[in-house]
């Protein structure tokens, strides 16, 4: 502690705030020992000494008024006087304390003290952090300063470096509320003309609700000209809540913004669009929804935020979403990057609107299939199995009709889909229709065999044995089917299944015996497993 105290004045405010936070909890733990009158651990005096050294460090660092101001305005580990006496001094009380002090700081800023307080602002703004919990109090402080003392805020901006200008939205928000329209317009015009702080201006527009459409269009125009993707996204978001089919903002802002982002193949906007939800995406026209989908094609994978957007669009425009996945499947086949995923292995809500129209779902994927397409099982077929994981009856009926009455291409299409399932009972009507359709020597019957034998993950030494026995039991009903081809296929399949069961049984027993010999006893095997 003496080492830290001696060198405290040489350390950054960021480090001092963190050290004080850590030492606060050491102090609280030590106090329990120091106040133990029975001295159960025999170190009460040592604990008291440690408390005194921590207090010495605390008092020294807090003697620096600039540090106290800094930790009040910046950070989330800041420690204040009530923390040392009251362990119940919670987050809500801390925030109240900080906001009250920030108000006092604003009151203390006079023309004579501007230089001193600008240095405080400059030091706070120089803090490097990507944690959103670092600057809320500081941002509110700047907003309140600009609102109550617009002249001071304007002069601060006149000398601001890049770090301070990172907080330009807070200044603009305050100036907008200050009632000093002339100063507000002058600042806004200056930074808009400079074209270097378009993101900040757009974020300010998101905060205020009284910005003219001409101002928004001007920022968008400059952002596009400067190839500032983030600024374009922020301009779109700034008035997204006011965009509906009757609003000119859709054509004037959303359409040029999304078309620009499509051209840039930049879909980062999805990570900030979650808050738009039902107020924006479901009310888009078909043409506008397709623009959103065009932009999403460039995403390397469909994650949570993108799926939420697709759910909103799939309700009114399911055909467009199926077409979107068709484009992603084509992109996957052409894309050299292995990281590109056309669709996730499991949906978390999108399957519901997509499964509402079975005919549309199957027809959309069928339109992508051509004879001899060996990849169907791994893309389009898997997409359908992801949307219909339980193989519902309407889905089964449509596939059965295709298997029985469709073309040879339809048969290949159905086979590619079924290989994504595990021979569940729900798939059997379709498989029977295929068996009845195909001749006994048709090589495609091997794909029916594969569909029936798929098991997924099994467990235990005799996992495959048990899985195949269950499949054999389910297949017994096929032997009573009125269709001769189905009966004959079932008898032959069960015969091969018996051979497979016997083979798996022998293999499992041999491996078990070999382990016994290698590890001497079952007890040793159990110990190794446990």
Task: Describe every region a protein language model picked out.
Residues 1-530:
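Non-catalytic all-alpha helical scaffold/repeat segments
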């Amino acid at each position: 502690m003496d080492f830290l105290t001696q060198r405290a004045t040489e350390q950054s405010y960021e480090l001092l705030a963190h050290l004080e936070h850590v030492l606060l909890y050491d102090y609280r733990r030590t106090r329990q020992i120091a106040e133990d009158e029975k001295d159960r651990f025999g170190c009460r005096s040592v604990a008291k000494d440690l408390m005194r050294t921590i207090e010495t460090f605390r008092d020294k660092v807090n003697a620096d008024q600039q540090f106290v101001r800094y930790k009040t305005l910046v950070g989330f580990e800041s420690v204040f006087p009530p923390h040392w006496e009251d362990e119940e001094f919670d987050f809500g009380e801390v925030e109240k304390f900080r906001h009250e002090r920030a108000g006092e700081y604003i009151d203390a800023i006079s023309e004579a003290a501007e230089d001193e307080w600008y240095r405080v602002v400059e030091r706070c703004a120089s803090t490097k952090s990507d944690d959103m919990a670092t600057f809320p109090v500081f941002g509110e402080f700047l907003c309140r300063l600009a609102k109550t003392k617009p002249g001071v805020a304007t002069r601060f901006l006149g000398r601001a470096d890049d770090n301070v200008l990172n907080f330009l939205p807070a200044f603009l928000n305050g100036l907008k509320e200050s009632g000093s329209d002339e100063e507000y317009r002058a600042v806004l015009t200056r930074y808009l003309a400079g074209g270097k702080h378009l993101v900040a201006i757009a974020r300010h527009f998101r905060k205020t609700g009284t910005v003219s459409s001409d101002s928004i269009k001007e920022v968008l125009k400059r952002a596009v000209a400067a190839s500032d993707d983030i600024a374009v996204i922020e301009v779109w978001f700034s008035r997204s809540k006011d965009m509906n089919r009757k609003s000119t903002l859709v054509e004037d802002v959303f359409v040029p913004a999304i078309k620009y982002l499509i051209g840039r193949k930049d879909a980062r906007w999805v990570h900030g669009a979650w808050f738009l939800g039902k107020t924006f995406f479901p009310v888009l026209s078909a043409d506008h929804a397709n623009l959103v989908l065009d932009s999403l094609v460039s995403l390397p994978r469909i994650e949570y935020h993108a799926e939420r957007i697709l759910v909103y669009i799939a309700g009114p425009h399911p055909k467009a979403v199926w077409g979107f996945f068709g484009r992603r499947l084509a992109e996957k086949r052409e894309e050299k990057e292995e990281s590109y995923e056309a669709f996730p292995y499991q949906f978390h809500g999108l399957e519901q609107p997509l499964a509402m129209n079975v005919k549309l779902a199957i027809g959309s994927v069928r339109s992508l299939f051509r004879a001899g397409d060996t990849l169907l099982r791994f893309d389009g077929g898997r997409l359908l199995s992801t949307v219909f994981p339980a193989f519902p009856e309407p889905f089964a009926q449509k596939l059965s009709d295709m298997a029985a009455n469709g073309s040879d291409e339809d048969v290949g299409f159905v086979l590619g889909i079924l290989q994504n399932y595990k021979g569940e009972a729900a798939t059997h009507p379709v498989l029977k229709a295929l068996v009845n359709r195909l001749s006994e020597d048709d090589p495609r019957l091997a794909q029916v065999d594969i569909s029936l034998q798929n098991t997924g993950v099994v467990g235990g030494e005799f996992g495959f044995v048990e899985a195949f026995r269950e499949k054999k039991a389910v297949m017994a009903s096929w032997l009573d089917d009125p269709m001769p081809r189905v009966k004959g296929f079932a008898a032959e399949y069960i015969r091969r299944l018996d051979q497979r069961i016997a083979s798996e049984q022998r293999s499992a027993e041999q491996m078990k015996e070999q382990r016994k010999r290698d590890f001497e006893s079952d007890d040793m095997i159990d110990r190794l497993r446990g």
